[in-house]
Amino acid sequence: LLHLYSWPITSGGALKRNLVLALLTLLLLLPFCKKKEPEEPTQEVFFEVKAGESTSRIALRLDSLDIISHHRLFVISAKLKGLDRSLQQGVYRLHTNMSEDSVLLMLSRGAIATVAVTIPEGLRLRDIASRLTKAGVVNQDTFLALCRDKKLLLEFNIPFGSFEGLLFPDTYSFPLGILPEDVLRVMVRRFFEVAEPMLREVSLDTLLILASIVEREAYLEEERSVIASVFLNRLREGLPLESCATIEYALPRHKERLTYADLRIPSPYNTYINTGLPPGPICSPGKASLEAVANPKKTKYLYFVSKGDGSHYFSQTAAEHEQMKRKLNKERSRNGA
């Protein structure tokens, strides 16, 4: 640090003054040159640097929370290192009794605190909002309201009434304090990043709605593209999709087994009584289901029925389908199912 005080030596008095100033500066900065040993157990503190906040104000707040011990030394160090205008906005995970130098380094590098959240495939908006809320990222009610916000939907040119299906399943690292609308934007942009190549071949509504149905209907990876082909074939033939997954979406609560009465509920999502696509997606599909719809297996299948073990029987005709259903029902009766 002596090079900071390289004035010309014109007299003994000037030399003495320069040496005294240099020694004083070294003494001031001494706490930054060694790690401070905490006198008592440290406690984790979440500290927010606000937009436009001055270094002196930040230092005073750090001192008041016992994160640092010398707010003046923090300010001096920031100025000497040219970092007094480089402290970045955000929420930081700090602890009490840190050295001023360590805190300064974290705040100038923008080493903000983050939280990781994994969103699996096939979740609905309410389930995603619940996971984000449990992780401390958003408030559930606020987030769900934003998922139906018309301005945000218009921002992404979404043709549906909500962001159902568009919050892409992935593992995210969100900074603490992130705005809920920015959480939504991150997840929607991730969807379009993944789906962009597929949207060159298939419209958004067809891709997303069918992929969401495939996500809920398919259990085995190798069957996704076959199931997608069944629904696409039925659309081309003008037949109802007849997806149990859409009935489950329309029901007010989850049921382990659907009844014939459920298949007649009056809902635009009831694909047993309505032809064409339902009004929107029924969950957030993963990449595999999106790809299955964009590149379906070439088949003539129009029907499938669950074997009960996750796999399905596929049929080309209604007669073959009914025969297979009777066979499965007999097997289940014998097994007491």
Residue spans for each PLM region:
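Positively charged n-region of N-terminal signal peptides that target proteins for export
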Residues: 15-18
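Leucine-biased recognition of intrinsically disordered, low-complexity hydrophobic segments
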Residues: 1-4
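Signal peptide-directed extracytoplasmic domains
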Residues: 34-196
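Bacterial extracytoplasmic/cell-wall-associated proteins, especially those involved in peptidoglycan
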Residues: 130-138, 144, 152-337
